[in-house]
């Protein structure tokens, strides 16, 4: 039986930093209001780079670290809700940029759960025995999706990309997973046109900015997602005490505080970086993972047992437990 492992990690963020003080110059807000409610103090914003540009930088870093060329890749899966275009896919643009002419490439849309869903999907490709190497990337330019006059959402999000190189392994690394969706609660987090421009339709295109019912999403995370994480651990071959780190979607520092208590783990096992990057949706978990490797918390030698969990629009939520 074939197994998969994460062999390399990388991330990339745009150069421009926008602080809470900067936002206070263009909207009715201040640093204390934002940081006390979210933990966020700044975010990176793309001036000219597209989602595929950010993802391409990550892909190049991954290949350089592994010492491989694009021609050695079998697939590219790119998780995003801010694609360059609906067609072609952002993943296809990345494929062309890095010369991965033998790889199939596609986008996956599962909002802030996107990277977890994409990594789970990629693991199945490797486990089939037909594929040996692939890139899994989360990339977002959310600065293009928010209404910059709406302080309830604009202050939360940032741009960035992160990803992993997934390769075949002789040993098992993926220990447990849980992927979930609940479309009946889809209206609490929306982005994009809900209507159509067509002479054959009576529908009108609705406002396309990202919209969120913050309280509902907050309650969903600390209730449903925490319960799902606990259940995934209970059904896995490990105990909660075996987890070295839990890398959760970086939406809000207060959510992480409550999740740690609900799951029954020390808050120190939940690293955070939303104070530097804001909420980068599908990019948040791979950026955090890459930083943990850079800081030496996760040596990338298979010695650490790590839980990854994303949650967001759809509603969607997903958890993976693996050794890294």
From Swiss-Prot:
Q: Which CDD domains match?
A: KAS_III (cd00830)
Task: Output the InterPro entries linked to this UniProt entry.
Answer: ACP_syn_III_C (IPR013747), ACP_syn_III_N (IPR013751), FabH (IPR004655), Thiolase-like (IPR016039)
Q: What is its EC number?
A: 2.3.1.180, 2.3.1.300
Classify the source by domain of life.
Answer: Bacteria
The GO cellular component terms are:
cytoplasm
Annotated Gene Ontology MF terms? 3-oxoacyl-[acyl-carrier-protein] synthase activity; beta-ketoacyl-acyl-carrier-protein synthase III activity
Q: Name one Pfam family in it.
A: ACP_syn_III_C
Q: Where is the active site?
A: 112, 249, 279
Give the GO terms filed under biological process for this record. fatty acid biosynthetic process
Which keywords does this Swiss-Prot/TrEMBL entry list?
Answer: Acyltransferase, Cytoplasm, Fatty acid biosynthesis, Fatty acid metabolism, Lipid biosynthesis, Lipid metabolism, Multifunctional enzyme, Transferase
Pathway-wise, it operates in: Lipid metabolism; fatty acid biosynthesis
Q: Which reaction is recorded as catalysed by this protein?
A: malonyl-[ACP] + acetyl-CoA + H(+) = 3-oxobutanoyl-[ACP] + CO2 + CoA; butanoyl-CoA + malonyl-[ACP] + H(+) = 3-oxohexanoyl-[ACP] + CO2 + CoA; 2-methylpropanoyl-CoA + malonyl-[ACP] + H(+) = 4-methyl-3-oxopentanoyl-[ACP] + CO2 + CoA; 3-methylbutanoyl-CoA + malonyl-[ACP] + H(+) = 5-methyl-3-oxohexanoyl-[ACP] + CO2 + CoA
UniProt subcellular location: Cytoplasm
Q: Quaternary structure per UniProt?
A: Homodimer.
Q: What does the comment on domains in this protein's record state?
A: The last Arg residue of the ACP-binding site is essential for the weak association between ACP/AcpP and FabH.
Q: What family is this?
A: Belongs to the thiolase-like superfamily. FabH family.
Q: What is this protein called?
A: Beta-ketoacyl-[acyl-carrier-protein] synthase III
């Amino acid at each position: 039986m074939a197994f998969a492992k994460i062999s390399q990690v990388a991330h990339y963020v745009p150069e421009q930093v926008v602080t809470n003080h900067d936002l206070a110059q263009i909207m009715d807000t201040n640093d204390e209001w934002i940081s006390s409610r979210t933990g966020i103090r700044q975010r990176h914003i793309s001036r000219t780079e597209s989602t595929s540009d950010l993802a391409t930088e990550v892909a190049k870093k991954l290949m350089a670290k592994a010492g491989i060329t694009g021609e050695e890749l079998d697939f590219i899966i790119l998780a995003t809700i801010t694609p360059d275009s609906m067609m072609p896919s952002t993943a296809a643009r990345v494929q062309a940029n890095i010369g991965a002419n033998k790889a199939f490439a596609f986008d996956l849309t599962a909002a802030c759960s996107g990277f977890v869903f994409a990594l789970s999907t990629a693991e199945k490709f490797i486990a089939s025995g037909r594929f040996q190497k692939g890139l899994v990337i989360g990339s977002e330019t959310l600065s293009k999706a928010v209404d910059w006059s709406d302080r309830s959402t604009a202050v939360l999000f940032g741009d960035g990309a992160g990803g992993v190189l997934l390769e075949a392994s002789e040993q098992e690394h993926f220990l447990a997973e849980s992927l979930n969706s609940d479309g009946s609660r889809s209206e609490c987090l929306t982005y994009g046109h809900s209507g159509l421009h067509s002479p054959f339709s009576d529908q009108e295109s609705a406002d396309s900015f990202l919209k969120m019912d913050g309280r509902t999403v907050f309650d969903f995370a600390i209730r449903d997602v925490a319960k799902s994480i606990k259940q995934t651990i209970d059904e896995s071959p490990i105990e909660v005490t075996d987890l070295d780190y839990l890398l959760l979607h970086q939406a809000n520092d207060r959510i992480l505080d409550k999740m740690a208590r609900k799951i029954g783990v020390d808050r120190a096992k939940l690293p955070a970086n939303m104070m530097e990057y804001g909420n980068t949706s599908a990019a948040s978990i791979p950026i955090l993972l890459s930083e943990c490797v850079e800081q030496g918390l996760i040596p990338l030698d298979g010695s650490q047992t790590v839980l990854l969990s994303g949650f967001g629009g759809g509603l969607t939520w997903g958890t993976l437990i693996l050794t890294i």
